[in-house]
Amino acid sequence: MFSKYVLATLLALFAQSMCIQELSLPPEGSHSTAATRSKKAKTAISEDIMYNYLMQFDYLPKSDLETGALRTEDQLKEAIRSLQSFGNITVTGEIDSATARLIQKPRCGVGDRRSADSFSPDNLYHEIGSNVRVRRFALQGPKWSRTDLTWSMVNRSMPDASKVERMVQTALDVWANHSKLTFREVYSDQADIQILFARRAHGDGYKFDGPGQVLAHAFYPGEGRGGDAHFDADETWNFDGESDDSHGTNFLNVALHELGHSLGLAHSAIPDAVMFPWYQNNEVAGNLPDDDRYGIQQLYGTKEKTWGPYKPQTTTTTTTTTTMRAMIYRADKPAYWPWNNPSNNPNNDRNRARERQEEERRRQEKERRRQEEERRHQEEERRRQVEERQRQEEERWRQEQERQEEENRRRKIEHKSQWERNPSKERNRPRERQEMERRRQEQERQEQERQEQEDRRRERERDRQLEWERRNRNGAREPVTPTANTTPRPTNKPYPTVHRQHHHHNKPRKPKPDSCMTYYDAISIIRGELFIFRGPYLWRIGTSGLYNGYPTEIRRHWSALPENLTKVDAVYENKQRQIVFFIGREYYVFNSVMLAPGFPKPLASLGLPPTLTHIDASFVWGHNNRTYMTSGTLYWRIDDYTGQVELDYPRDMSIWSGVGYNIDAAFQYLDGKTYFFKNLGYWEFNDDRMKVAHARAKLSARRWMQCARSANEVDDEQRWTASLVSEGEETGRSGSRELRINHFILSILLLAIANWRS
């Protein structure tokens, strides 16, 4: 009995010791079977993830994708060591926790292997005999053959496009400030560097993986897609330059890194470098770390001269040997020799003054960029407000159209129901239709006659006004005496809108218009000077006033215009500094005074209606710097890059409140304000309120021709007040006459009633 109890106790103690052995950590060098199985299972899972990561970023060749399981363990460990060395973590060759954290960090999508080969221990920073450090940055592939590069943004319709453009320009400025590179934004698909936001597979063979890990990738300099930078649109980006990652990944830091690839730099193993492949939210503040600065200067040179060591050169003569030193220029990090730097000479203040001037210039440049950025923000806000107002106006117009259509449908239904209730009228329907058509034609004829009479009345009124202005200006010195062969006065539209090449050898020249008594066909700022067009003549006004010898014929400046030119409809200078003339159904484009090849062209080539006979005015609106054209009651906006009318035009001129229809001319003056002209007056336009600044037109001759007021001329306000007074007096006189007549009639009625009663 006792032996059985002892045996059971020993078995229990043995089982307990085995459990304790299983739960305890194995000693160093031990190989527990269970622990080995667990480690191998974990390593198999980690190796699968690690294989994909190492192949994606060039630590293992991509050609072995299908035979990856046949690699040796030594190859995998060597690749892991390269990754750990490049990532600046402890090199173990094992998939430890630090390595797992490293491969989970967001990073650039460009591979590391090609640049990792350059980072062997004997190529790191170390001191050599000449006390010069060897560069650690990596150069990859070709570089750009020139230093003036262009860039453009593909996704211009994305919500934060303006912020992206600003950040990209800031990143490019950082690279430009430390090299001889210059960057210019263009609106073309042929730019050297194209910025693209895309998702997943986007056609270049390097698809994105959604939010996290791969943030972007870029291509090294070259043709085609060379230099292009692509960013993952699924990422949460912070376009405000904030250092707090809670609002998203700092786009400025990522763009600075990717554009380094676009310029020819590969990845760097220095953690503080911009070209470190893993994302880190470091504040650059306009300065590059030394590693990146040496790399970009090795490729494209530096803006300023650096001081390096003297290289000894020996010159031998017949009697003595003299050692001479020459200064050489080094593109990488130079050695510093205080006695060779003239800025350390206390007697030399010129270098210090130059440094102060350079520092002041940089400060002013920074302030200028800040002001430019602020102005751009304000311009965007103003443009947004204008577009919102236009959208509301379009919505109101659309609702009005729908209401009218609904009203027309309702009337048709009521009319149809009336015919259905009274079938006997069906027989008279053709006759009524004919009668309605006859009435419509009669109304059109009467309306046309009324319009012609109104036009003739306006022409006579304008002629009388011009004659009155001439008499008040000249007084009794130049009396107007009509003769039998007097040339008829010009009418409101004295010149045809369609110009043809006819040769009138005996055609008399038109008299020069009076500068102070005429209206304007067109007006524009050309090369910073004011040009006013009337008939075949023009005035040219500079900073000192009207040039001598003007007005002169337009064809003396632009001889390629039609020989029988009688007037121009509109003129403006476009953003390419070309001068555009609109004459009838055609338009001409001049490079200075030379006609551009292929011109003239019809107005329809701009996307305008083929039935349009002329343009009233063309101008660049200072509010949004866009080009507009008007004709009659409509206006259009032109896309300056495609040269075509934008899709949602034309629109009604009533949007320009107070301007009215059928204007004569319009332009943007040097003060940035827009002015509209009609007859002898003009209006200044208030861009913020979208209406004219003054309801009554001001005389054009006083403002633009500096014409003085004559002694006999009556002020506009006095004339307006006098007209009101005269109307009031006339009303009072007519009222008193009516009162006397009424009293007389009342007396007669009373007498008649008295006689009838008697």
From Swiss-Prot:
Enzyme Commission number(s): 3.4.24.-
Bilayer topology annotation: Single-pass type I membrane protein
Residues in compartment: Cytoplasmic: 757-758
Single Gene Ontology MF annotation: metalloendopeptidase activity
Keyword DNA repair: no
Biased composition (Basic and acidic residues): 349-476
Biased composition (Low complexity): 338-348, 479-494
Active-site residues per Swiss-Prot or TrEMBL entry: 258
Obligatory cofactor(s): Ca(2+); Zn(2+)
Signal peptide as annotated in the record: 1-17
Basic residues: bias regions: 499-510
Disruption of the gene: reported phenotype: Defective larval tissue histolysis and epithelial fusion during metamorphosis. Impaired fasciculation of ISNb nerves. Conditional RNAi-mediated knockdown in the fat body reduced the imd/Relish-induced antibacterial response.
Pfam assignment, any one: Hemopexin
Hemopexin repeat residue numbers: 513-561, 565-610, 612-659, 660-707
Purpose of the protein: Has metalloproteinase activity. Proteolytically cleaves the PGRP-LC receptor; involved in gut-fat body innate immunological communication (GFIC)-mediated activation of the imd/Relish signal transduction pathway. Required for larval tissue histolysis during metamorphosis and is involved in pupal head eversion and fusion of the wing imaginal tissue. Required for growth of the dorsal air sac primordium and development of the dorsal air sacs. Promotes embryonic motor axon fasciculation. Cleaves and activates frac to promote motor axon bundling during outgrowth.
Similarity field: Belongs to the peptidase M10A family.
Name the record gives this protein: Matrix metalloproteinase-2
